[in-house]
């Protein structure tokens, strides 16, 4: 069960401006996502996350969808995708998302007051997306966030550091001198 670690060590690195960025099947959809890697990740999430009495898995589009779908299939917990497109459905809640890379609006549908949710995403980097989602779910919708999981955490400060939100991760990494460095192979609890 070391596919995630090895896949990160093998990940190609690209440069975007002054930023070194790893390209990984979980966070980018390329290179190809092998089923054994996805299976390992879902098993590790099931072992780490608080799933008892969770009503819904909530994930932002787009790169949380494949992980959350696999988790939903394994746990029979319904999946809600926070979309980047507004549909105008009853109960739709907009949220403003700002990361180190972009700004946009996202829209929550099918999460109601009192719902107990697991929030799941592929990567925790600046924390902007995750913080906006958690704030909207708790403050605007009135959902109870039972647990929060990000598969990969990029080392460094993020917007959740000084909040009450606890994000569990499966592995923590950084990029140094054109290579992925494993900071914590077990992630955060």
From Swiss-Prot:
Name the source's superkingdom: Archaea
- Asked if the Swiss-Prot or TrEMBL record annotates the protein with the keyword Metal-binding, the reply is no
UniProt-listed HAMAP family? Hypx_phosphoribosyltr
Q: Supply the enzyme class, top level.
A: transferase
Classification via SUPFAM superfamilies: PRTase-like (SSF53271)
UniProt keyword Transferase, yes or no: yes
What name does UniProt use for this protein? HGPRTase-like protein
The record's comment on protein family reads: Belongs to the purine/pyrimidine phosphoribosyltransferase family. Archaeal HPRT subfamily.
Q: What EC number(s) has UniProt assigned to this enzyme?
A: 2.4.2.-
GO molecular function terms attached to this record: transferase activity
Task: Recite the UniProt keywords alphabetically.
Answer: Purine salvage, Transferase
InterPro entries cross-referenced by the UniProt entry: HGPRTase-like, PRibTrfase_dom, PRTase-like, Pur/Pyrimidine_PRTase
Q: What does this protein do?
A: May catalyze a purine salvage reaction, the substrate is unknown.
One GO process term, biological-process aspect: purine ribonucleoside salvage
Gene3D superfamilies linked: 3.40.50.2020
């Amino acid at each position: 069960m070391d596919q995630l670690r090895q896949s990160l060590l093998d990940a190609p690195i690209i440069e975007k401006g002054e930023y070194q960025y790893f390209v990984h099947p979980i966070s980018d959809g390329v290179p190809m996502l092998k089923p054994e890697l996805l299976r390992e990740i879902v098993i590790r999430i099931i072992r780490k996350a608080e799933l008892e009495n969770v009503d819904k898995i909530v994930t932002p589009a787009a790169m949380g969808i494949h992980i959350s779908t696999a988790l939903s299939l394994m746990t029979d917990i319904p999946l809600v995708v926070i979309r980047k497109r507004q549909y105008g459905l009853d109960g739709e809640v907009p949220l403003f998302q700002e990361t180190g890379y972009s700004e946009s609006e996202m829209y929550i549908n099918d999460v109601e007051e009192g719902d107990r949710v697991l929030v799941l995403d592929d990567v925790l980097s600046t924390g902007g997306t995750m913080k906006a989602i958690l704030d909207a779910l708790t403050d605007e919708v009135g959902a109870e966030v039972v647990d929060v999981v990000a598969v990969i955490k990029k080392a460094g400060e993020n917007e959740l550091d000084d909040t009450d939100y606890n994000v569990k991760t499966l592995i923590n990494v950084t990029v140094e001198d054109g290579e992925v460095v494993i900071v914590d192979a077990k992630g955060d609890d």
